[in-house]
């Protein structure tokens, strides 16, 4: 099953926008394994620390028995609405694409799976 990382705006949004991330995860879980950044970064972490943790997580490579080689932990990034205005989400997208990880909106991933 494809594993996705959800990226979107967090900083400056009430409760770190966790409701939007949880809503997206709930929709995507029908078709994908899904992680959200809130699982890896503690509430109130400085932005620089959060980004270091999340970029490390996003670019992690592990041995894939299915593929018989080391592969990206995530096979895709699902972008929440508003990602374009988020410095962190834009950086996550750029890094993911540089690592060959496809990035699409949540709706695009859902449409592809149906």
Placement of each model-derived feature along the sequence:
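Conserved catalytic or regulatory cores that recognize and/or transform ribose-phosphate-containing ligands
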Residues: 1-114
